[in-house]
Design a protein with these regions (language model features):
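Non-ligating segments of multi-cofactor redox enzymes
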Residues: 1-193, 199-226
């Protein structure tokens, strides 16, 4: 789970940063990390939420734990934006990285490894982390990609680039018969045949594989010439 350059920077073996931790530190300390901001924007413009579907280790854990695919509720899916906004507001109000103290990803990738390494003790902050992790894991078991759909602020941040990213999910309407095979395959519970540019799409490609008519494909966005 704790991959050196892919997730929580509190992980004992991390060598880079968590964009949400980065955003909080930007607010708390006022130092602008231009390089990392540029990297996040560049990645967002390249693939949008593609990271969530292909590289995120916590997303992989979601897939391993859950076998249920429920239709996403549009209003509920915006909760991750509320969490993103609340995270930034809390960093400003308390001058601290408050979300990191609750983040279930940090629980799994930092708190538990540090206790096993003997660096940290089982104390109140550790138990709080275990509580948020337990709730999140329970949600993952009940709902496919529960964390990615409703809670992940990183997913909310990358989804802002989804419709503008170079990597796009394309629907050939002349081939589509509205059979909803793509919707049955989608772990995010969206309807790719009608919502192929949705902000919740993690571009995992399961809908492409599930469409036996070849109506869904990935393509690179073409730059418009004036």
């Amino acid at each position: 789970m704790c991959i050196r350059d892919r997730h929580c920077y509190a992980c004992p073996w991390a060598i880079t940063i968590c964009p949400i931790g980065l955003a909080q530190n930007l607010i708390v300390f006022g130092t602008v990390p231009y390089f990392w901001i540029g990297m996040i924007v560049a990645y967002g413009l390249a693939a949008g939420r593609g990271f969530c579907g292909w590289f995120c280790p916590f997303g992989t854990l979601n897939d391993l734990l859950s076998f249920r695919k429920v239709k996403i509720h549009r209003v509920a899916s915006f909760s991750k934006f509320v969490i993103l906004g609340g995270t930034l507001l809390a960093a400003w109000a308390f001058a601290d990285t408050m979300f990191c103290k609750l983040c279930p990803v940090a629980s799994l990738e930092a708190s538990i490894p540090y206790v096993f390494l003997g660096v940290a003790r089982v104390n109140r902050p550790f138990l709080v982390h275990m509580g948020t992790l337990a709730v999140t894991l329970a949600g993952m078991v009940l709902i496919a990609r529960f964390w990615c759909r409703y809670l992940c602020p990183m997913g909310a941040l990358l989804s802002l680039f989804n419709r503008a990213s170079a990597l796009q999910l394309n629907l050939n309407e002349s081939l589509c018969t509205q059979c909803t095979a793509c919707a049955s395959a989608c772990p995010m519970g969206i309807q790719p045949h009608t919502e192929h540019d949705d902000h919740n799409c993690i571009k995992c490609g399961r809908c492409v594989d599930g469409c036996h008519l070849g109506a869904l494909t990935f393509r690179l966005r073409r730059l418009r010439r004036r």
